């Protein structure tokens, strides 16, 4: 039985890694890609999705989101006020596992809600935006996200296919020099314009201008044709995704995973030191751990 389950994981991981036109080149990158962990559940979402496979999603599939573009200037004004108060910022406490790797590029964020209730700080500092996103049940996660001049987010795919990613341009260079590329297709942000894409395709972003880019960043629940798959999405979101909740400031709640992240980060630091000192030894250790985990789970 364990071998059958393992083969299902391998098959689903293979599909995830080869689903798009753009793929990781190195085998080691494909094997270590964290999206493989959620391969089986993601394949369920892909198979039962109401939206056909595409790098970019037509926002008209979600008419309820029109209220955001209709009120984009109101949202923009609250984002500007937050940024002026230096509240759109990186994590100061190593408590944001999901986006920790972005911070070294200068990327910053201010959470509005994350797979649960809206954050206390968001209700206090940007109530109009919070009211707007809370009026749309499909919105599972929300934040203001800033990509500063010269910043580049490396190629990656998000691990969970239970949502689509939505960006609403608030403060942008309105230039082709500030863009996102999803599965090889580029889009550049524009003030007041929304774009939606499947974040489980490989994507990256770059701001080659001297102007900050601020967008309203949302996770929109993926619609599916089978109610049990929708139920799986709800349960997974409440248990796993909600555990990655983090804070903007004191008073905000932190999910269980991010409470553990400072300790996980220390292990990662040790791993990076080993990699720097002896690369072959690092990979030997890394894959030995992978094999032990596989053996422990499936055999």
For the regions a protein language model found, what residue spans apply to each?
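A short beta-strand-loop-beta hairpin characteristic of the jelly-roll/cupin
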Residues: 170-191
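A generic beta-sheet turn/junction motif
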Residues: 148, 159-161, 182, 209-211
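A short hydrophobic beta-strand segment most commonly corresponding to one strand
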Residues: 165-170, 196, 211-226
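Short beta-strand or tight-loop elements
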Residues: 140, 151, 162-166, 201
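Short, solvent-exposed loop/turn segments at secondary-structure junctions
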Residues: 149, 175, 201-203, 221-223
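Short beta-strand His + acidic residue motifs that chelate non-heme Fe in jelly-roll/DSBH
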Residues: 153-156, 178-180, 197, 203-209
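Conserved metal-binding segment of the jelly-roll/cupin
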Residues: 188-202
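Fe(II)/2-oxoglutarate oxygenase catalytic core
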Residues: 1-143, 147-157, 175-178, 214, ...
């Amino acid at each position: 039985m364990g071998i059958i389950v393992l083969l299902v994981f391998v098959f689903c991981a293979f599909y995830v890694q080869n689903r798009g036109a753009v793929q990781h080149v190195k085998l080691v990158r494909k094997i270590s890609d964290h999206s493989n962990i959620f391969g089986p559940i993601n394949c369920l979402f892909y198979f039962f999705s109401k939206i056909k496979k595409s790098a970019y999603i037509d926002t008209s599939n979600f008419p309820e989101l029109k209220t955001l573009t209709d009120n984009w200037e109101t949202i923009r004004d609250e984002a500007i006020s937050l940024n002026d108060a230096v509240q759109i910022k990186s994590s100061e406490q190593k408590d944001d596992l999901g986006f920790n790797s972005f911070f070294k590029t200068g990327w910053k964020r201010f959470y509005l809600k994350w797979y649960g209730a809206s954050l206390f700080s968001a209700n206090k500092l940007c109530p109009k935006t919070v009211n707007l996103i809370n009026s749309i049940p499909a919105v599972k996660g929300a934040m203001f996200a800033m990509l500063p001049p010269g910043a580049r987010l490396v190629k990656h795919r998000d691990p969970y296919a239970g949502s689509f990613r939505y960006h609403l341009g608030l403060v942008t260079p309105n230039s082709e020099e500030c863009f996102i590329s999803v599965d090889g297709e580029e889009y550049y942000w524009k003030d007041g314009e929304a774009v939606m894409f499947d974040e489980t395709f490989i994507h990256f972003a770059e701001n080659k201008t001297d102007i900050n880019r601020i967008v309203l960043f949302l996770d929109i629940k993926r619609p599916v044709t089978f109610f049990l798959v929708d139920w799986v999405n709800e349960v997974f979101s409440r248990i796993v995704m909600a555990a990655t909740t983090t804070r903007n400031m004191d008073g905000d709640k932190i999910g269980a995973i991010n409470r553990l992240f400072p300790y996980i980060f220390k292990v990662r630091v040790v791993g990076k030191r080993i990699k720097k000192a002896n690369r072959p030894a690092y990979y030997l250790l890394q894959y030995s751990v992978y094999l032990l985990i596989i053996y422990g789970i499936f055999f």
